[in-house]
Amino acid sequence: MALNIENIIAEIKEASILELNDLVKAIEEEFGVTAAAPVAAAADGAADAGAAKDSFDVELTSAGDKKVGVIKVVREITGEGLKEAKAIVDGAPSVIKEGVSAAEAEEIKAKLEEAGASVTLK
């Protein structure tokens, strides 16, 4: 079977975000790799250690007992539809928002925890 790169790219273009997320996870597991971007080493580690983190990823670690409420909050935060929000909650642990400010991350965390979810900021 010949590998047709153009067909693969066309399929990827038509896939939803959730399908692409599942694809990335499957590739990571199959080949033992990660999709994380490499971290550049700082020239001066001491100067970097003192700098405050300015962007955070909000990760849903568990939906808890009130799954329906958590799905509603995830829909509100992400702007996704019901099906997509449910898939995000069912797929926990999963990142809800990436690269948000500390204030926004804390606000999202508070909303999710109020709905009954467990959340971590990375």
From Swiss-Prot:
GO MF annotations, alphabetized: mRNA binding; structural constituent of ribosome
Swiss-Prot/TrEMBL GO biological process terms: translation
InterPro entries in the cross-refs: Ribosomal_bL12 (IPR000206), Ribosomal_bL12_C (IPR013823), Ribosomal_bL12_C/ClpS-like (IPR014719), Ribosomal_bL12_oligo (IPR008932), Ribosomal_bL12_oligo_N_sf (IPR036235)
Keywords of this entry: Ribonucleoprotein, Ribosomal protein
Residue ranges the record marks as coiled coil: none
Any one GO CC term of the record: cytosolic large ribosomal subunit
Record has Repeat as a keyword: no
Subunit record text: Homodimer. Part of the ribosomal stalk of the 50S ribosomal subunit. Forms a multimeric L10(L12)X complex, where L10 forms an elongated spine to which 2 to 4 L12 dimers bind in a sequential fashion. Binds GTP-bound translation factors.
Function: Forms part of the ribosomal stalk which helps the ribosome interact with GTP-bound translation factors. Is thus essential for accurate translation.
Family the UniProt entry places it in: Belongs to the bacterial ribosomal protein bL12 family.
Protein's recorded name: Large ribosomal subunit protein bL12
The organism of origin for this protein: Streptococcus thermophilus (strain ATCC BAA-491 / LMD-9)
